[in-house]
Amino acid sequence: NEGAVTVPAAGLHFSRELMKRMEIKGIDFSFITMHCGLGGFRDIDVEDLTKHKMDSEQMFVEAEACRIVNEAKDRGNKVCAVGTDVMRAIETAVGTDGHLKEFEGWTNKFIFPPYDFSLANAMVSNFHMPLSTMLMLVCSYGGYELVMDAYNIALKEDYRFGTYGDAMLILDK
């Protein structure tokens, strides 16, 4: 689907070759469509986070994606959200039973601490810029102290930040 104005950057770390190697090891992939906008790159300029307004982004979660994710969850396997956009999308489309539901529409969901995640028990994320909504989401998922420790190591080790930067894997506690 056409419509994104920016790339969902965390997925750039997954080459076809890497995905094939993961598939051989029994890892299933599920795909959603999220028309990523520029709003996530805007600094948060309010002290009260409940007053921050996210730009709406169009998203599509199809039946096949739901089937793959829900079967993995029911088997007790890891469900890994690749990127903050995917995490926002699945948290928008998750039902009260904790299962992913088909969804076609828009989301302006802003995830910030504290937040109780419903579906993913792992997340891949790039290293985001300070004061960004994306960093807020990562801190919500990984815990502020753990994420800031990772960022301090990234700074010391000259990791790259931003869209074409390095990534981290966060596993649920």
For each predicted feature, which ranges?
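Surface-exposed, charge/polar-rich loops and edge strands
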Residues: 1-173
